[in-house]
Regions:
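Bacterial Sec-dependent N-terminal signal peptides
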Residues: 1-25
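Flexible coil/turn and secondary-structure edge motifs
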Residues: 16-218
Length: 218
């Protein structure tokens, strides 16, 4: 019996230790020095998490000056996250997008405006019925200039709405591309029920709000 009790105590202690490590690992991500992605062939990259990446990908794809948007994961403390793993809420990662854009056409500041203007900025840990830490709102900065832009926009919105803004502000570390079947999901699956009932309506609300930012025929 003593051996059984001892074994149980060891198991509990090990479990508690693992649970204690997760917040510390996540804290290290939040307090890390940002990684700056260099401009390549005149194109810059920005990173955002705002609920389901299918929705966010389609929104940024419609913006003038944006060349490509890739769905993936970022903001967590584990390596090589997958859709299944991120959905457990234990990786720290959120569904995110990589926005590849021409800074001569659209600025990082405008991309942040698109971000706040295309979501429910006060909803914590999700957008709509997509709920959980994997759907939380995060804006990633690569340098202090970007950080100040984000904080200024966030503060102004909080004052305008007289409410707390849910978006977390993280130093960018790494973006992990999602599985191929997630890429261009809205465009490739227009008849999917989620796309019809959630993604397209969200995109249309954004379009009505920011008509001057849209590409032609979008």
């Amino acid at each position: 019996m003593k051996k059984i009790i001892a074994a149980c105590l060891i198991t509990i202690a090990f479990s508690c230790e693992n649970k204690a490590q997760t917040p510390k690992a996540q804290e290290a991500i939040i307090n890390a020095k940002p990684v700056e992605v260099p401009i390549k062939n005149g194109k810059a990259k920005a990173y955002f998490a705002s609920g389901c990446f299918w929705c966010v990908e389609a929104i940024y794809e419609s913006v003038k000056g944006v060349d490509e948007v890739i769905s993936g994961y970022s903001g967590g403390h584990t390596q090589n996250p997958t859709y299944k793993a991120s959905n457990t809420g234990k990786t720290g990662h959120a569904e995110a997008v990589e926005v590849i854009y021409d800074p001569n056409i659209v600025s990082f500041e405008t991309l942040v405006e698109v971000y706040f203007g295309s979501q429910n900025p006060t909803q914590v840990n999700g957008q709509g019925n997509d709920r959980g830490s994997q759907y939380r709102s995060i804006i990633f900065y690569q340098n202090d200039e970007q950080k100040q832009i984000i904080l200024k926009k966030k503060d102004a919105l909080a004052k305008k709405l007289n409410a707390s803004i849910a978006a977390e502000v993280y130093p960018f570390q790494k973006f992990w591309r999602a599985e191929d079947y997630h890429q261009n999901y809205e465009r490739l699956h227009p008849n999917n029920s989620y796309i019809q009932n959630v993604s397209i309506p969200r995109l249309n609300r954004f379009k009505a709000k920011f008509p001057d930012l849209l590409k032609e025929n979008k």
